[in-house]
């Protein structure tokens, strides 16, 4: 079993904050503080215990780990990924989904012909971007919105996009 199988990425440490070992946590939950209600683990599935200190104007959480007390220790956490077990999450409503569940789904054109698969979901701060690997092995990055992806199910997504136009 892949070490990340059945894990959902729910946050990442962006940087340290101050001199007492606090960190800035970018939460992928909505609202951001909902991450703290989850049983959190690292990539090795070891439990993580985080305490909220405050929330900044960008919606990022300023937190502390129980065993991190200095800025130097906190600096080593930059890029540290925080997960929860997929089984610990509630099933999404019929018209909802978890972004992580989209990975590797088939991509269909509007005529329901398979044209590729979702290779990756990215976010550089301006919204989710879907990386599509087409059947000819080329890839394209497209914004994740209803204009490009009018149908999203647990089994496939429909892409409303003509390549090369």
Curated annotation (Swiss-Prot):
Protein name: Ribosome maturation factor RimM
Any one GO BP annotation for this protein: rRNA processing
NCBIfam families given in the database record: 16S_RimM
All copies of domain PRC barrel, residue ranges: 94-163
Annotated GO CC locations: cytoplasm; ribosome
Entry-linked Pfam families: PRC, RimM
Function: An accessory protein needed during the final step in the assembly of 30S ribosomal subunit, possibly for assembly of the head region. Essential for efficient processing of 16S rRNA. May be needed both before and after RbfA during the maturation of 16S rRNA. It has affinity for free ribosomal 30S subunits but not for 70S ribosomes.
UniProt-annotated location(s): Cytoplasm
Keywords: Chaperone, Cytoplasm, Ribosome biogenesis, rRNA processing
Oligomeric form and interacting partners: Binds ribosomal protein uS19.
Lineage: Bacteria, Pseudomonadati, Pseudomonadota, Alphaproteobacteria, Rickettsiales
Family designation: Belongs to the RimM family.
Superkingdom field: Bacteria
Taxonomic source organism: Rickettsia akari (strain Hartford)
